[in-house]
Amino acid sequence: MTSTLPNASTPDPASLQPSVRPGAHGRFGRFGGQYVPETLMPALAELEQAAAQAWNDPAFTAELNQLLKNYVGRATPLYEAERLTAHYRRADGGPRIWLKREDLNHTGAHKINNALGQALLALRMGKKRIIAETGAGQHGVATATVCARFGLECVIYMGAEDMRRQALNVFRMRLLGATVQPVTAGTATLKDATSEAIRDWVTNVESTHYILGSVAGPHPYPMLVRDFHAVIGQEARQQCREAFGRLPDVLMACVGGGSNAMGLFHPFVECTNVRLIGVEAAGDGVATGRHAATITEGRAGVLHGAMSLLLQDSDGQVQEAHSISAGLDYPGVGPEHSYLREIGRAEYGAVTDQQALGALRLVSELEGIIPALETAHAFAWLEQLCPTLPDGSEVVINCSGRGDKDVNTVAEKLGDQL
C-alpha cells in the first residue's frame, strides 16, 4: 500500500464534545476559521444564524425528515457483504464487512443529504438563486435536483476536465434545468470550480446562496455540511446495534474534501473504541507527486476560506492534485479532518488509482455492486486493514456513491482486461 496509518491515541474526551466542535470563530483546534472577503461576512453570519434557528424549529426538522424519507429514500440499508467478507477471511477468521448503502439514495450518492438541507435553508433566507461547485458531478446533480424540486435557479461550476470525465452527470444536471458553467482556469478541476463559485457568490451575494458540497470552506460550512450528513452515522449506530448488538470496531470512508466520511464519523467521534479511518487518493503514487493525499502529505495553509492541511510546494503555493476520481481530485481537505488527525482520533491512509480500480472490479464481481471510483478507494484499504483485524471484528464502509458515472473512465482503463 502507499502509506501506513499511525497508531491512534486516545484524545481528551472534553475536546470532542459536539458543543465545542467547532469552537470560537469556527475553529477545530488551529484549523477552520473564516478567511474570506469582507463582502461575504454578512452572508456567512446570516447562514449561521439561519441554520441555528432552523435546527431549533420543529417545522424545519419535520419537513427535512419527511423529504429525507419520501424523496431521498432514507434510511439507507446497512448491508452485510458476505462474499467480500469471505474473500478476506483467513484460516483463523477475520472481520465481517458491512456497507452503509448511500449509493441507494435518490441521485445515487450521499450528496443529496446536504443539498436538500441547504436548499431548505436558502428558502428560509429568501434566496432564489443557487450556485454550487462539483467535481465528480454528484454534488452538482444533487443540487440541480433539489433546485428543480423547489423551483430555484441553479448554476453549477465544473472544471472542463471534470466535465469531460463526467459527461453523463453534466447531461443529468442540464436535464434537471441547471446551467453548467465550464471552468478552464488552472487544472480545470474541483479546486478551480470552487474558486469560480466563490467569485460568483461575492458578486451576487444578496440574491444567491452557495451550496458548498463538502466539509470545507469558511465557517459555518464545515459544521453545516457535517450536520446534514450526520444522518449517515446516526442511522449506522442504530443499524449496527440491530445487526450485531454493538458498535462497530472500524468505520471507513474515502476522503477528498471529506463530507461522506465526516457524516459517518461524527456520531461516533466520542466512542473512542471505534476506529475512524479515512482513505485518500494516492493517484500515481505519493512518491511521484501526482496524487491527492492531502492529509498524508499536506501542510497547514489557507484555501477557499479556511485553514486546513493542503498540498503545497516549498514556496507555500497550492499544488495540483491528481486522482482518477474526480471527486477526490482536490488539494485540500475539510478542517475537522485535519483536526481529528492532529489529535489522533482518526487515521488516514492513501491508495493509488490502480488499487482503486482493482477494488472497484473486486466489489463489482463479488457483491454485484459497482461502487463509485471515490468509494473504491475505501474498499481498496481492506487489503491492508483486514489482515490486522482479529476474528469477529465488525467493519462498516460508507458506500458513498454508485459507479454509473465512472463506467466510461473504468472502460478506458480496464476495457482490454474484461
From Swiss-Prot:
Organism domain of life: Bacteria
PROSITE patterns: TRP_SYNTHASE_BETA
In-chain residues carrying the UniProt-annotated modification N6-(pyridoxal phosphate)lysine: K111
Segments for region (Disordered): 1-23
Pathway the protein acts in: Amino-acid biosynthesis; L-tryptophan biosynthesis; L-tryptophan from chorismate: step 5/5
GO molecular function: tryptophan synthase activity
Catalytically driven reaction(s): (1S,2R)-1-C-(indol-3-yl)glycerol 3-phosphate + L-serine = D-glyceraldehyde 3-phosphate + L-tryptophan + H2O
Keyword terms, alphabetized: Amino-acid biosynthesis, Aromatic amino acid biosynthesis, Lyase, Pyridoxal phosphate, Tryptophan biosynthesis
Name of one Pfam family that matches: PALP
Biased composition (Polar residues): 1-18
InterPro entries for this protein: Trp_synth_b_CS (IPR006653), Trp_synth_beta (IPR006654), Trp_synth_beta/beta-like (IPR023026), TrpB-like_PALP (IPR001926), TrpB-like_PALP_sf (IPR036052)
Keyword Transport included in the entry's annotation: no
Oligomeric and partner information: Tetramer of two alpha and two beta chains.
Protein name listed in UniProt: Tryptophan synthase beta chain
Organism: Parasynechococcus marenigrum (strain WH8102)
